[in-house]
Amino acid sequence: GGIDVIVTSPLRRARQTADAVARATGAPLLADDGLIETDFGKWEGMTIAEVSQRWPDQVSAWMRSVDVAPPGGESFADVISRVNAALDRLLAEHQFRTLLLVSHVSPIKIAACRAMLAPPATLFRIQLDVASLCEIGWFADGPAVVRSLNDTAHLSRAGR
């Protein structure tokens, strides 16, 4: 089957993608704040190289622990709690339906780690490219399976 419901982060970069998919599929579109990207605080909009130059000790600590937050931002532990609450709610509300979640790197990594029962620090070991796809099957009795992660095959097809 096709997509039953599209759920997007309300941030513009996700919303634009979700709007395009909704137009193409006719699926209803919902926004969920739980799917918003990590708030990187003072690091927002900077590259990791720029951040590392200005805050070397904080970056080092942040890259070692999900409990460390960027200055003025959210820790990954906080994001994990927020994303898991959104996933719990969405899975309960949309059982037996096919959802397309349009989100950002951190929430997608968190969903994949949850599906694989992987520890939180696994977030630091997953690479996700822009506009990549991740497919996760969630089952009513609890377990989940990651069917694909960081799939970018559609991007090369789109460029032809």
Predicted regions and their residues:
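Beta-strand elements within well-structured catalytic alpha/beta cores of enzymes
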Residues: 97-103, 107
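Short glycine/proline- and acidic residue-enriched helix-loop micro-motifs
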Residues: 58-78
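Generic structural signal for well-ordered alpha-helical scaffold segments
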Residues: 80, 84-92, 112
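Short beta-strand scaffold positions
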Residues: 8-9, 81, 102-103
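Active-site signature of alpha/beta-hydrolase-fold catalytic machinery across serine-
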Residues: 20, 110-114
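Phosphate-coordination/substrate-recognition cap region in phosphate-metabolizing enzymes
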Residues: 1-59
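Acidic, low-complexity terminal tails and accessory targeting/binding regions
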Residues: 1-2, 38-50, 92-98, 113-160
